[in-house]
């Protein structure tokens, strides 16, 4: 898989992709992450990527020209499954969406900034608009990092223990069951006996029960679908 991220602040996320699972995925050749500085696609001496909005609205708007140049340059080299725009008013990102996007070969993620992008970009070049939550960030860079991480980590081979990824919260619309490690008794705080029993079937039953109980308590909306 290849993910191309277009941003006005590449330094905000470069370090994120050079450590932990994201670095491992790239070292294994299972994922490529390419970060593109939108200012490299400007043609004026000030390398401006924003301008004042028509209508006298507050804030600044990302310009069409550099964004189109960057996207077109990438599309000239390969086909893309989706051109994604990170925006608070997009479709809510969730685990099923991450699962679906992990099957793609090539993705572009355009990070929003300032007041937003010229809407014509959204009308003519963007294929999918995604939000990671009902709140506003300084820019879409953190949202792009969140999405890339969720997508890449479930590519087969990225995580050594694939069952670990498959049992994460939200994979089956349930929150994950509690997990414990040694010591089994710490200051009287004990691990549930069932987990020490070695009885695989009963442990699985306990795991499902815990997942259901936690979901009912913390995220009952997940059980409404």
Swiss-Prot record:
S-adenosyl-L-methionine binds at residues 112, 132-137. One of its GO terms (biological process) is tRNA N1-guanine methylation. It is found in: Cytoplasm. Keywords: Cytoplasm, Methyltransferase, S-adenosyl-L-methionine, Transferase, tRNA processing. InterPro entries: Alpha/beta_knot_MTases, tRNA_m1G_MeTrfase_C_sf, tRNA_m1G_MeTrfase_TrmD, tRNA_m1G_MTases_N, tRNA_MeTrfase_TRMD/TRM10. Specifically methylates guanosine-37 in various tRNAs. Belongs to the RNA methyltransferase TrmD family. This is tRNA (guanine-N(1)-)-methyltransferase. The gene is trmD.
């Amino acid at each position: 898989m290849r993910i191309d991220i277009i941003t006005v602040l590449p330094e905000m996320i470069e370090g994120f992709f050079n450590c932990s699972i994201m670095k491992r995925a790239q070292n294994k050749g299972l994922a490529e992450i390419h970060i593109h500085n939108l200012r490299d696609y400007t043609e004026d001496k000030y390398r401006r990527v924003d301008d004042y909005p028509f209508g006298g609205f507050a804030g600044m708007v990302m310009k069409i020209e550099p964004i189109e140049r960057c996207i077109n340059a990438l599309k000239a080299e390969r086909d893309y499954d989706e051109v994604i725009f990170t925006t608070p008013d997009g479709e809510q990102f969730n685990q099923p969406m991450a699962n679906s996007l992990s099957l793609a070969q090539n993705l572009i993620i355009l990070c929003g900034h300032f007041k937003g992008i010229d809407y014509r970009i959204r009308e003519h070049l963007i294929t999918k608009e995604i939000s990671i939550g009902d709140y506003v960030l300084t820019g879409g860079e953190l949202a792009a990092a969140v999405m890339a991480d969720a997508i890449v980590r479930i590519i087969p081979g990225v995580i050594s223990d694939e069952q670990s990824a498959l049992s994460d919260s939200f994979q089956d619309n349930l929150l994950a069951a509690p997990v414990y490690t040694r010591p089994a008794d710490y200051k009287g705080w004990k691990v549930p006996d069932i987990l020490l029993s070695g009885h695989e079937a009963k442990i699985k039953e306990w795991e499902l029960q815990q997942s259901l109980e936690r979901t009912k308590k913390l995220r009952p909306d997940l059980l409404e679908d």
